[in-house]
Amino acid sequence: MVFYFTSSSVNSSAYTIYMGKDKYENEDLIKHGWPEDIWFHVDKLSSAHVYLRLHKGENIEDIPKEVLMDCAHLVKANSIQGCKMNNVNVVYTPWSNLKKTADMDVGQIGFHRQKDVKIVTVEKKVNEILNRLEKTKVERFPDLAAEKECRDREERNEKKAQIQEMKKREKEEMKKKREMDELRSYSSLMKVENMSSNQDGNDSDEFM
Protein backbone atom coordinates (compact mmCIF):
# COMPACT_ATOMS: atom_id res chain seq x y z
CA MET A 1 0.00 0.00 0.00
CA VAL A 2 1.23 3.47 -0.90
CA PHE A 3 -0.19 6.69 0.51
CA TYR A 4 -0.50 9.61 -1.91
CA PHE A 5 -0.95 13.27 -1.01
CA THR A 6 -1.36 16.43 -3.05
CA SER A 7 0.57 19.60 -2.32
CA SER A 8 -0.01 22.93 -4.00
CA SER A 9 1.94 26.16 -4.19
CA VAL A 10 0.52 29.60 -4.89
CA ASN A 11 2.67 29.99 -8.00
CA SER A 12 2.71 26.43 -9.34
CA SER A 13 0.52 23.48 -10.22
CA ALA A 14 -0.08 20.61 -7.80
CA TYR A 15 2.63 18.17 -6.75
CA THR A 16 2.29 14.52 -5.77
CA ILE A 17 3.81 13.36 -2.48
CA TYR A 18 3.86 9.67 -1.60
CA MET A 19 5.16 7.30 1.06
CA GLY A 20 5.12 3.60 1.84
CA LYS A 21 3.24 1.89 4.65
CA ASP A 22 6.32 0.27 6.22
CA LYS A 23 10.04 -0.41 5.73
CA TYR A 24 9.36 -3.41 3.48
CA GLU A 25 7.32 -1.27 1.13
CA ASN A 26 10.08 1.32 1.24
CA GLU A 27 12.30 -1.23 -0.51
CA ASP A 28 10.00 -1.19 -3.54
CA LEU A 29 9.86 2.60 -3.51
CA ILE A 30 13.66 2.77 -3.47
CA LYS A 31 13.91 0.25 -6.30
CA HIS A 32 11.28 1.77 -8.57
CA GLY A 33 11.74 5.49 -7.95
CA TRP A 34 11.70 8.00 -10.80
CA PRO A 35 14.42 10.49 -11.79
CA GLU A 36 11.88 13.21 -10.95
CA ASP A 37 11.55 12.00 -7.34
CA ILE A 38 13.03 13.74 -4.29
CA TRP A 39 13.46 11.58 -1.17
CA PHE A 40 12.83 12.94 2.36
CA HIS A 41 13.72 11.46 5.77
CA VAL A 42 14.17 12.75 9.32
CA ASP A 43 17.89 13.20 9.96
CA LYS A 44 19.42 10.65 12.35
CA LEU A 45 16.01 9.33 13.44
CA SER A 46 13.66 6.63 12.24
CA SER A 47 10.89 7.95 10.00
CA ALA A 48 8.82 7.25 6.94
CA HIS A 49 10.42 7.57 3.52
CA VAL A 50 8.55 10.38 1.80
CA TYR A 51 8.92 11.17 -1.90
CA LEU A 52 8.06 14.29 -3.83
CA ARG A 53 7.52 13.89 -7.56
CA LEU A 54 8.74 16.95 -9.42
CA HIS A 55 7.33 18.12 -12.71
CA LYS A 56 9.39 17.23 -15.77
CA GLY A 57 12.26 19.60 -16.33
CA GLU A 58 12.44 20.65 -12.67
CA ASN A 59 15.23 19.92 -10.21
CA ILE A 60 15.67 20.03 -6.45
CA GLU A 61 16.31 23.79 -6.54
CA ASP A 62 12.89 24.39 -8.09
CA ILE A 63 10.83 23.03 -5.18
CA PRO A 64 8.44 25.76 -3.99
CA LYS A 65 8.93 26.65 -0.32
CA GLU A 66 5.37 25.68 0.59
CA VAL A 67 5.74 22.26 -1.04
CA LEU A 68 9.11 21.71 0.65
CA MET A 69 7.59 22.42 4.06
CA ASP A 70 4.64 20.10 3.31
CA CYS A 71 7.08 17.24 2.68
CA ALA A 72 9.16 18.06 5.76
CA HIS A 73 6.11 18.21 8.03
CA LEU A 74 4.80 14.92 6.65
CA VAL A 75 8.13 13.20 7.37
CA LYS A 76 8.30 14.65 10.88
CA ALA A 77 4.73 13.58 11.63
CA ASN A 78 5.59 10.03 10.57
CA SER A 79 8.60 9.69 12.86
CA ILE A 80 7.94 8.07 16.25
CA GLN A 81 10.55 10.26 17.93
CA GLY A 82 10.56 13.21 15.57
CA CYS A 83 6.84 13.89 15.88
CA LYS A 84 7.34 14.77 19.59
CA MET A 85 10.28 17.11 19.03
CA ASN A 86 10.84 20.69 17.91
CA ASN A 87 13.59 21.88 15.54
CA VAL A 88 13.76 18.59 13.66
CA ASN A 89 16.15 18.38 10.72
CA VAL A 90 14.86 16.69 7.59
CA VAL A 91 17.28 15.58 4.88
CA TYR A 92 16.27 15.44 1.24
CA THR A 93 18.02 14.44 -1.96
CA PRO A 94 17.23 13.25 -5.50
CA TRP A 95 16.17 9.62 -5.78
CA SER A 96 19.15 9.01 -8.08
CA ASN A 97 21.46 9.82 -5.15
CA LEU A 98 20.13 6.96 -3.01
CA LYS A 99 22.55 4.08 -2.62
CA LYS A 100 21.38 0.58 -1.70
CA THR A 101 23.86 -2.26 -1.16
CA ALA A 102 23.32 -5.94 -0.38
CA ASP A 103 24.63 -5.65 3.18
CA MET A 104 22.09 -2.99 4.19
CA ASP A 105 19.04 -3.76 6.31
CA VAL A 106 15.51 -3.57 4.94
CA GLY A 107 14.59 0.06 4.32
CA GLN A 108 18.13 1.29 4.94
CA ILE A 109 19.89 3.47 2.37
CA GLY A 110 23.04 5.51 1.89
CA PHE A 111 24.05 8.25 -0.52
CA HIS A 112 26.30 8.28 -3.56
CA ARG A 113 27.21 11.95 -3.05
CA GLN A 114 26.86 13.57 0.37
CA LYS A 115 27.15 17.03 -1.21
CA ASP A 116 23.81 16.46 -2.95
CA VAL A 117 21.99 16.00 0.36
CA LYS A 118 20.13 19.07 1.62
CA ILE A 119 18.62 19.84 5.02
CA VAL A 120 15.49 21.73 6.02
CA THR A 121 14.46 22.34 9.64
CA VAL A 122 10.92 21.98 10.96
CA GLU A 123 10.73 24.22 14.01
CA LYS A 124 7.46 22.87 15.31
CA LYS A 125 4.37 20.95 14.29
CA VAL A 126 1.86 22.93 12.22
CA ASN A 127 -1.53 21.23 12.36
CA GLU A 128 -2.93 23.29 9.50
CA ILE A 129 -0.38 21.78 7.11
CA LEU A 130 -0.97 18.21 8.26
CA ASN A 131 -4.76 18.57 8.21
CA ARG A 132 -4.66 19.98 4.68
CA LEU A 133 -2.48 17.12 3.46
CA GLU A 134 -4.62 14.53 5.24
CA LYS A 135 -7.67 15.71 3.28
CA THR A 136 -5.88 14.82 0.03
CA LYS A 137 -4.69 11.40 1.21
CA VAL A 138 -5.40 8.44 -1.09
CA GLU A 139 -4.45 4.80 -0.54
CA ARG A 140 -3.40 2.80 -3.59
CA PHE A 141 -1.85 -0.55 -4.42
CA PRO A 142 0.19 0.41 -7.49
CA ASP A 143 2.31 -1.81 -9.67
CA LEU A 144 5.43 0.29 -9.13
CA ALA A 145 7.54 -1.67 -11.62
CA ALA A 146 4.92 -1.30 -14.37
CA GLU A 147 4.50 2.42 -13.70
CA LYS A 148 8.26 2.93 -13.86
CA GLU A 149 8.49 0.99 -17.13
CA CYS A 150 5.65 3.05 -18.61
CA ARG A 151 7.41 6.26 -17.60
CA ASP A 152 10.73 5.06 -19.05
CA ARG A 153 9.05 3.94 -22.29
CA GLU A 154 7.46 7.36 -22.73
CA GLU A 155 10.83 8.99 -22.18
CA ARG A 156 12.46 6.71 -24.76
CA ASN A 157 9.73 7.54 -27.28
CA GLU A 158 10.17 11.26 -26.63
CA LYS A 159 13.92 11.03 -27.15
CA LYS A 160 13.39 8.98 -30.31
CA ALA A 161 10.98 11.60 -31.65
CA GLN A 162 13.46 14.38 -30.80
CA ILE A 163 16.26 12.56 -32.64
CA GLN A 164 14.03 12.02 -35.67
CA GLU A 165 13.04 15.68 -35.67
CA MET A 166 16.68 16.74 -35.38
CA LYS A 167 17.66 14.49 -38.30
CA LYS A 168 14.78 15.89 -40.34
CA ARG A 169 15.93 19.47 -39.69
CA GLU A 170 19.52 18.56 -40.53
CA LYS A 171 18.37 16.97 -43.78
CA GLU A 172 16.33 20.05 -44.68
CA GLU A 173 19.25 22.34 -43.85
CA MET A 174 21.61 20.25 -45.99
CA LYS A 175 19.13 20.35 -48.86
CA LYS A 176 18.79 24.12 -48.52
CA LYS A 177 22.57 24.54 -48.41
CA ARG A 178 22.96 22.35 -51.50
CA GLU A 179 20.36 24.39 -53.36
CA MET A 180 22.09 27.63 -52.37
CA ASP A 181 25.46 26.24 -53.49
CA GLU A 182 23.95 25.19 -56.82
CA LEU A 183 22.36 28.61 -57.22
CA ARG A 184 25.64 30.39 -56.52
CA SER A 185 27.45 28.04 -58.90
CA TYR A 186 24.84 28.71 -61.61
CA SER A 187 25.03 32.48 -61.05
CA SER A 188 28.82 32.35 -61.24
CA LEU A 189 28.65 30.32 -64.46
CA MET A 190 26.20 32.76 -66.03
CA LYS A 191 28.48 35.66 -65.12
CA VAL A 192 31.46 33.98 -66.78
CA GLU A 193 29.41 33.22 -69.91
CA ASN A 194 28.24 36.82 -70.11
CA MET A 195 31.80 38.07 -69.83
CA SER A 196 32.92 35.69 -72.56
CA SER A 197 30.07 36.81 -74.79
CA ASN A 198 30.95 40.47 -74.31
CA GLN A 199 34.60 39.82 -75.08
CA ASP A 200 33.68 37.95 -78.26
CA GLY A 201 31.59 40.90 -79.35
CA ASN A 202 34.42 43.39 -78.84
CA ASP A 203 36.83 41.29 -80.90
CA SER A 204 34.37 41.25 -83.78
CA ASP A 205 34.05 45.04 -83.69
CA GLU A 206 37.81 45.43 -84.03
CA PHE A 207 37.88 43.40 -87.27
CA MET A 208 35.04 45.33 -88.86
Curated annotation (Swiss-Prot):
Organism in which the protein naturally occurs: Homo sapiens (Human)
Q: What is this protein called?
A: Coiled-coil domain-containing protein 25
Coiled-coil residues: 117-187
* Basic and acidic residues: bias regions: 148-184
Q: What is its main location?
A: membrane
Which positions carry Phosphoserine? Answer: 204
Write out the function statement from the record: Transmembrane receptor that senses neutrophil extracellular traps (NETs) and triggers the ILK-PARVB pathway to enhance cell motility. NETs are mainly composed of DNA fibers and are released by neutrophils to bind pathogens during inflammation. Formation of NETs is also associated with cancer metastasis, NET-DNA acting as a chemotactic factor to attract cancer cells.
Question: Which family is this sequence assigned to?
Answer: Belongs to the CCDC25 family.
Per UniProt, subunit arrangement is: Interacts (via cytoplasmic region) with ILK.
